[in-house]
Design a protein with these regions (language model features):
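Residue-level detector of Asp-centered blade-edge/turn motifs that repeat once per structural unit
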Residues: 45-46, 97-98, 141-142, 239-240, ...
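Short beta-strand element of the alpha/beta-hydrolase
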Residues: 456-467
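Hydrophobic beta-strand positions that form the internal "hydrophobic ladder"
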Residues: 47-50, 102, 146, 244, ...
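Non-catalytic accessory segments flanking enzyme active sites
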Residues: 42, 147-149, 175-180, 184-203, ...
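Short loop/turn segments that connect beta-strands within beta-propeller blades
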Residues: 73-76, 118-122, 203-207, 267-271, ...
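A flexible loop/linker signature enriched in serine peptidases of the S9 family
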Residues: 54-67, 83-91, 105-115, 123, ...
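Active-site-proximal cap/loop segments of hydrolase catalytic domains
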Residues: 482, 487-488, 495-687
Length: 687
């Protein structure tokens, strides 16, 4: 397909004229699910171009579709060029070393394979044609080799064997599955015996992978990258292309209660992996070589089995293996990071007091300095002296911005996705506030006005409680829990980063473990009252509480321990019985850390804040929602909640999605979810 410049001037002018005449309106869930989603910016090696993804939503097909776009940054006003167009998505872009082609993943041929699109024109050509799907990949710095993850049976001699076994399983009339160790299921998928195995293969003169891929991690009983959310950030080529470093957890019988990921080094052509971090029993991951190849950076935790421990940056001398903690004194947890091209600093994102900022970290001293302002930086890329980042806020989905290293205050906006479609939408105004919470600590939260707020008026409250529990409900844009949907429906919203939230120092994050119903509930109570006192447009007498996951747990806890707090409650995938949760969730390292061990060794701590003991006090109307593919907080928890409500005659409804997991992701289901929730709120706050 020839590259085509998207020419929309006339259409946008007409659209702008129509929107100029349209009356302002509130934001709706239909707006939310139809929004185009910008992500994965990647600068070309010479920083002259950036390729990125845009996901659109087809409501008729009830699914999203992701394609690649490009901006030429040399232009005075860069215009978006669409690179790919197919019924199948195109994702995971990688630049060729010369910047003359883009590699990407697509299932346009029927299976997920690597493709190459020359920027000089012409159609995309398939680089791999393997019997199994390519899950993710990296291109070597020289462009002559791929590292890629494939889902295979480790005891198979070749890829064809794995394909044949999957096909045989599908045809087998007997459907029973036999397990002799955990995991038996993970997130939303039953285990079928396959592992993510890292392979390497050369690219021949014709631009194809013609030789059989060589396993790099197959001798390790584990997944590379990790399941369920790992990606190519968990493995990396060295600058000379001769070595691959990857992160893996040896599974064995302890996989379900271990977070001991180690870094392994292996020749890119195959060989025995060498453990680089055997001394650390906690999590080591996301290795990246410095530009000169002499230093290996990676993120590491210190406490085994604690998934919310602080990720700090470690630098390892490649020649000697000597390590030093770079950000040990910085009380923030590193999310994503990249080396600056000169090797003197690293760029990293981290939660920070209700924001998710981009920081520059000095490679010698470890000093961190913020280079982005308010908002949420979801992705970024750096090449030469240029940085491109995707940044969102509570008032807008992600857009791309460009700035020069050393001059972050002069960021240029590169994209205007969704702005024409939402030109007549008036978003709710929001503000961060603080108050004295549990232990007299400063706690932060946000409030948001309805889109049509008027002076002197009061508005019902949607009180949103985040999950995690080690997370943050800050200045970001969500396609699942978005306060603007409630603002668009006439509600004020209040959301608190209670004790246990991230971005306020590790001690604050740690403080929730073993205290799920203690300090967090106190913070929520004090935060609600502080907000009501500070913002007179909040109608405290007409409020409903909503939460998912840990937030759903908190809905059950509020039901029995703050029973006069709200007119109604919405509980999505929430914990009802902590004992049942401990024995049925899949990642049991989580519950064992939070409660000090397995249930049979720590009964008292599990039961201390167990909602099931307080159901006799339940009286607030509750909407219970559950995804039946949620193996993190299984369906039995929602059924227990609903049964307790119904048996006592408490007004209640149960909404179940048979085809959703812990999150509601399908567009039509998201619309149904929001309309059901808003109807529930309207029933009890509009009386």
């Amino acid at each position: 397909m020839k590259l085509r410049l998207l020419v929309l001037a006339a259409a946008l002018a007409a659209s702008g004229a129509q929107h100029a005449q349209a009356a302002p309106r509130g934001f709706t869930v239909e707006d939310l699910v139809k929004m185009e989603r910008v992500g994965s910016p990647l600068l070309s090696p010479d920083a002259s171009k950036v390729v990125y993804t845009v996901r659109t939503t087809n409501m008729d097909k009830n699914r999203g579709n992701t394609q690649l776009w490009m901006l030429d940054l040399r232009a005075a006003k860069p215009a978006p060029v669409r690179l790919t167009q197919a019924d199948a998505s195109s994702t995971d872009p990688e630049w060729s070393p010369a910047g003359d082609a883009v590699y990407f993943l697509s299932a346009r041929s029927g299976s997920n394979q690597v493709w190459r699109l020359p920027l000089s024109g012409g159609e995309a050509a398939r680089v791999t044609d393997l019997p199994v799907d390519v899950e993710n990949f990296r291109l070597s710095p020289q462009g002559d080799r791929l590292a890629m993850s494939l889902a295979v049976f480790r005891d198979c001699a070749d890829l064809a064997c794995s394909k044949a076994r999957v096909e045989a399983q599908a045809k087998d009339k007997a459907t029973g599955k036999v397990y002799d160790r955990l995991f038996v299921r993970h997130w939303d998928t039953w285990k079928d015996g396959r592992n993510n195995v890292l392979y390497s293969a050369p690219i021949d003169a014709a631009g194809k992978v013609s030789a059989a891929p060589v396993s790099l991690s197959g001798t390790i009983d584990g997944d590379v990258p990790s399941k369920p959310f790992g990606d190519h950030e968990e493995y990396q080529f060295s600058p000379d292309g001769k070595t691959v470093v990857f992160s893996a957890r040896v599974a064995g019988k302890t996989e379900a209660w271990s977070t001991n990921f180690d870094l392994y080094s292996v020749p890119a052509t195959g060989g025995a992996p060498r453990n680089l971090t055997a001394e650390n029993p906690a999590w080591d991951t996301k290795a990246q070589f410095s530009p000169d190849g002499k230093t290996l950076a990676y993120t590491a935790m210190q406490r085994p089995t604690f998934e919310a421990d602080r990720f700090h940056l470690v630098l390892m001398d490649v020649a000697t293996g000597k390590k030093r903690a770079l950000t040990g004194a910085w009380d923030r947890s590193v999310s994503d990071y990249r080396w600056a091209p000169d090797g003197k600093s690293l760029l990293a994102t981290a939660d920070d007091v209700g924001q998710h900022r981009l920081f520059s970290i000095d490679a010698a001293s470890g000093k961190a300095s913020a280079v982005s302002g308010l908002g949420y930086v979801s992705a970024f890329s750096v090449a030469r002296d240029t940085v491109v980042m995707a940044q969102a806020s509570l008032a807008a989905g992600a857009q791309l911005y460009k700035f020069k290293l050393g001059a972050p205050s002069k960021a240029d906006k590169l994209t205007n996705v969704n702005e024409a479609a939402l030109a007549d939408v008036r978003f709710g105004e929001y503000e961060q506030f603080s108050f004295k919470g549990a232990n007299g600590d400063t706690v932060y939260g946000h409030v948001m006005k309805p889109w049509n707020a008027q002076p002197g008026q009061k508005y019902p409250i949607a009180f949103l409680v985040h999950g995690g529990p080690q997370g943050s409900f800050g200045n970001s844009w969500s396609y699942r829990w978005n306060p603007q949907v409630y603002a668009g429906a006439g509600y004020a919203t209040v959301f608190i980063d209670f004790h246990g939230s991230t971005g306020y120092g590790q001690a604050f994050t740690d403080s929730i473990s073993g205290d799920w119903g203690g300090k967090p509930l106190e913070d929520l109570k004090k935060g609600m009252e502080a907000a009501a006192a500070k913002f007179p447009w909040l109608d405290r007498e007409r409020s409903c509480a909503l939460g998912a996951s840990y937030g759903g747990y908190m809905m059950n806890w509020i039901e029995g321990n703050w029973s006069d707090g709200f007119k109604c409650i919405v509980n999505h995938d929430g914990v009802f019985d902590i004992r049942g949760m401990a024995y049925s969730t899949e990642e049991i390292w989580f519950t064992e850390w939070e409660y000090g061990g397995p249930y049979y060794k720590a009964v008292e701590s599990h039961e201390k804040f167990n909602p099931v003991h307080h159901v006799a006090k339940w009286k607030t109307p509750m909407l219970v929602i559950q995804g039946d593919l949620d193996f993190r907080i299984p369906t039995a928890q929602a059924l227990g909640t609903f049964t307790a409500l119904q048996r006592q005659g408490v007004d209640s409804k149960l909404l179940v999605f048979p085809d959703e997991n812990h999150w509601v992701l399908k567009p039509a289901n998201s619309v149904q979810w929001h309309h059901t929730v808003l109807d529930w709120l309207n029933t009890y706050t509009r009386k």
